[in-house]
């Protein structure tokens, strides 16, 4: 089953009939418009390309304008692709709404995490700090040794060190679908999802459901 592209609207909470508070993320899922259908004969695999939202005319490049015009859809804020399962069929120009998730219980949500800038090992990797006193005057938050000796004579790839933290693609799996509001194009999922308010999210049925 394909997924949908939405926008993170923020977090709130809703109450069950028993008065239990459930923290939810509100995802605004405007209609996804199919801009291209890929098939085995021409592309080597089956997939659909979709867009959503709107883009100012002066922000649309000529190649984008031609692509959207060929599909007969309004220019959106980006292009995303979803692989098609056996038996799934879509047509160019078709509109897909949040009702796609009406019967789905759990979803996987992918987004770009908030960027934290250049961070040290304590913040980035949860390293322990060294002694605050007892003769330690310079090495409170340093990582310590990062290698061995002349052999191997290098720092191994993947070594946890200071650097850019956040601003990377993150997927949170198996979030409960609390409510699907087709009238307002809203999807409410339990818990937090990656990214800042207003950022784009890819929502798919959970692979581990």
UniProtKB/Swiss-Prot annotation:
Which Pfam families does UniProt cross-reference here? Answer: Ribosomal_L3
Record note on modification: Methylated by PrmB.
InterPro entries referenced in this protein's UniProt entry, alphabetically: Ribosomal_uL3, Ribosomal_uL3_bac/org-type, Ribosomal_uL3_CS, Transl_B-barrel_sf
Modification sites for N5-methylglutamine: 150
Listed GO biological process terms: translation
Q: What does this protein do?
A: One of the primary rRNA binding proteins, it binds directly near the 3'-end of the 23S rRNA, where it nucleates assembly of the 50S subunit.
Q: Please give the NCBIfam families that the UniProt record associates with this protein.
A: L3_bact
Q: What is this protein called?
A: Large ribosomal subunit protein uL3
